[in-house]
């Protein structure tokens, strides 16, 4: 699966979590926080490529990006690119 996320799409971190959970079919128990994000991303078993465009380099969204990159280091099925 290929997914492009544009940082300008999300007015807040909750919108991001809801959108990503929907797109990647995260389980109902997904807690919409950074720990849950990491857990769900490292559990992905299908090849998944996520491209981050216009991504904020500070604040909550920057922390999300770091968590996604950390998860990609642990999961060979996940690739994160920042444009």
Residue ranges and their predicted role:
Residues 1-83:
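Positively charged, polar, low-complexity stretches
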């Amino acid at each position: 699966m290929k997914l492009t996320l544009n940082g300008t799409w999300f007015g807040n971190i909750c919108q991001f979590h809801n959108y990503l959970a929907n797109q990647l079919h995260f389980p109902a128990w997904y807690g919409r926080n950074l720990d849950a994000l990491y857990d769900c991303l490292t559990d992905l078993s299908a090849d998944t490529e996520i491209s981050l465009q216009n991504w904020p380099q500070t604040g909550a969204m920057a922390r999300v990006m770091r968590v996604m990159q950390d998860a990609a280091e642990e999961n060979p099925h996940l690739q994160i690119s920042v444009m």
